[in-house]
């Protein structure tokens, strides 16, 4: 089941990393680790980290988690930069629009899931870009700002 979930989350772009917390010495856990190594070799972008609850030093487990998180963070950052390049928006564009629309800053605001995007920030950027494209008042305001000559 663990292997299937890992494949599902990776193929459907639902996360950047899977961390499996397992009891030490559990036979099904040991078997799934063997299968998981084969699966990870097939899906090159998959980040999978098995951690056993005992038998492994706390410092060792902590450093392994930190390394895997750094990989996942880099993957999420690259995905976000790709979304910005694809939409043609800048961070300042997104921040300005969000500042003018306080509902987007609510903690419980539901951002719709976009297929092929795993990261929350990238999902939000795609969503705000779609809102900006549909917002006539915003488009009109941005055209007026571009039409004004800049005085030195």
Where are these regions (language model features)?
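An N-terminal assembly and electron-transfer interface module characteristic of large anaerobic redox
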Residues: 1-152
């Amino acid at each position: 089941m663990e292997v299937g979930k890992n494949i599902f989350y990776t193929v459907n772009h639902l996360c950047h990393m899977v961390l499996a917390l397992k009891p030490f010495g559990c036979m099904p856990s040991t078997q799934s680790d063997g299968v998981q190594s084969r699966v990870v070799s097939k899906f090159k972008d998959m980040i999978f980290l098995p951690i056993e609850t005992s038998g492994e030093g706390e410092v060792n487990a902590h450093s392994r988690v930190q390394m895997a998180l750094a990989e996942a963070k880099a993957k999420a950052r690259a995905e976000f930069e790709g979304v910005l390049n694809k939409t043609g928006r800048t961070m300042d564009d997104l921040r300005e629009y969000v500042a003018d629309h306080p509902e987007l800053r609510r903690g419980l605001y539901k951002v719709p899931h976009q297929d092929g995007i795993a990261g929350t920030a990238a999902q939000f950027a795609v969503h705000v870009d779609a809102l900006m494209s549909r917002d006539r008042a915003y488009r009109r305001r941005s055209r007026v700002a571009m039409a004004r000559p800049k005085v030195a």
